[in-house]
C-alpha cells in the first residue's frame, strides 16, 4: 500500500467520526456547510459551481474560488465522488467533500495529484443549467 493511500485511509477513518460528517455507501464523506433551496441536478445536467480543492494536509491544488471564476461542469463528466455529491445537492448548497482516492483519480493521479490520493473539496452549487 502506498504512503498516499495509507494516509488517505487513516484520514478518512478519523474524519468519519467527526460531528456533521455523513458517509455514503460508496465511502464518500461530506459535511453540509450551507443549505440552499434550489434545484437538484441529474446525471446529464450541467452545473455552475465554485470549488476549492486541497490535499488532506490542507495544501491547495486547484481553486475556482481563487481564480474568481465558477466553472460549468457536466455532472457525469467529473470525478465519481463529485458526480455522487452533486446529485444530492441543491442550488445554493455549500458542502465539504472528503473523497477517497477510488472516487477521485485512483491509482493514476492527474497533474499535481499523485495516485491513490484522498482529496478534500469545498463545493458551492451555484446553478443547474
What are these regions (language model features)?
Residues 1-129:
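Cross-family detector of peptidyl-prolyl cis-trans isomerase
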Amino acid at each position: 500500500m502506498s504512503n498516499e493511500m495509507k494516509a488517505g485511509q487513516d484520514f478518512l477513518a478519523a474524519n468519519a467520526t467527526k460531528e456533521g460528517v455523513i458517509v455514503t455507501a460508496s465511502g464518500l464523506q461530506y459535511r453540509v456547510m450551507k443549505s440552499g433551496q434550489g434545484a437538484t441536478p441529474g446525471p446529464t445536467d450541467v452545473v455552475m459551481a465554485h470549488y476549492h480543492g486541497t490535499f488532506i494536509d490542507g495544501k491547495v491544488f486547484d481553486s475556482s474560488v481563487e481564480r474568481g471564476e465558477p466553472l460549468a461542469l457536466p455532472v457525469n463528466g467529473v470525478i465519481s465522488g463529485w458526480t455522487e455529491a452533486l446529485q444530492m445537492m441543491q442550488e445554493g448548497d455549500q458542502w465539504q467533500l472528503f473523497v477517497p482516492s477510488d472516487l477521485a483519480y485512483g491509482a493514476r493521479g492527474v497533474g499535481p495529484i499523485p495516485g491513490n490520493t484522498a482529496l478534500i473539496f469545498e463545493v458551492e452549487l451555484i446553478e443547474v443549467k
